[in-house]
Design a protein with these regions (language model features):
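Extended alpha-helical scaffolding segments
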Residues: 1-7, 27-252
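Short Cys/His-rich metal-coordination motifs, predominantly Zn2+-binding knuckles/fingers
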Residues: 23
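Short metal-coordination and nucleic-acid-contact micro-motifs, chiefly zinc-binding Cys/His arrays
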Residues: 12-18
Length: 252
């Protein structure tokens, strides 16, 4: 790898360089950036410039580089890191990709956060489930204590969602950065105030897609189903309620 990197730098040594607006360094500036960050949207790009027709930005910029310049090395590092995170730690809700990660390397935070309080299935052996709200909150407190041991309070947490409105453009539809302590406190606040009786499985906090199904779903063959377009938009609204402690939308 080191030999290839050295060879690549040699090829770039004679190329014209400019200021990378992300790293702040002088780098070889690239116009074309990687696609396929989200596998299902294989042709969609996060960074692209195409103004050969309709002239959306003419009169503001003459060249794409006047709006943004990104270095080749920075672009490769950022896109490949993001592609790995999405491939390994994302969940898909209604066709939209949601991902949560710790820049220090803790894995699968988003998936685990959905089970901060255990959810039980019919296949599991019969056990003692939280039979009352008091039992439920006691279980939640134990789970939160375990999470606090895993995730230092000062660690950073990043939550984002991605969706492609067209085949060529990938959008960041939600983005938030917060400390580990805030992240856990907000999850705990949501689960402490938003729970219901699950019959023989006791009291549990429903997932955001379960809430969307109950609010907007139509019954088909004994099951609730929701159009993907409705699911992804409403799930993101509820994610805002969970992570940002915003009020639950009145229509839900």
């Amino acid at each position: 790898f080191d030999a290839f990197i050295g060879y690549h730098h040699t090829l770039q040594s004679t190329a014209q360089k400019g200021l990378c607006m992300i790293s702040g360094n002088e780098e070889l500036i690239v116009k074309n950036h990687p696609c396929g960050i989200v596998a299902k949207d294989g042709r969609a790009k996060l960074i692209s410039a195409n103004d050969k027709s309709n002239f959306t930005y003419r009169g503001r910029f003459i060249e794409p580089q006047q709006a943004l310049t990104v270095g080749h090395e920075t672009s490769q590092k950022a896109h490949n890191a993001l592609a790995w995170i999405i491939a390994n730690q994302s969940i898909m809700i209604g066709g939209r990709t949601f991902v949560c990660w710790n820049p220090k390397g803790d894995t699968s935070l988003f998936k685990d956060s959905e089970t901060l309080t255990p959810n039980y299935s019919d296949e599991e052996e019969k056990k003692d489930f939280p039979a009352t709200p008091t039992d439920y909150k006691a279980d939640l407190k134990k789970a939160l204590s375990g999470w606090q041991d895993k995730l230092p309070a000062e660690d950073d947490i990043v939550i984002a969602s991605f969706d492609a409105a067209t085949t060529g453009r990938l959008s960041i539809t939600y983005y938030n950065e917060l400390k580990g302590s805030d992240f856990l406190n907000r999850l705990a606040f949501w689960k402490e105030h938003c729970y219901w009786s699950s019959g023989k499985f006791g009291y549990q906090s429903p997932s955001i897609w379960e809430i969307v199904k109950c609010a907007f779903g139509t019954e088909q063959n004994g099951k609730l189903s929701v159009d993907d377009r409705v699911m992804r938009e409403q799930a993101q609204r509820l994610l805002h309620s969970v992570i940002d402690q915003a009020p639950i939308p009145q229509d839900i």
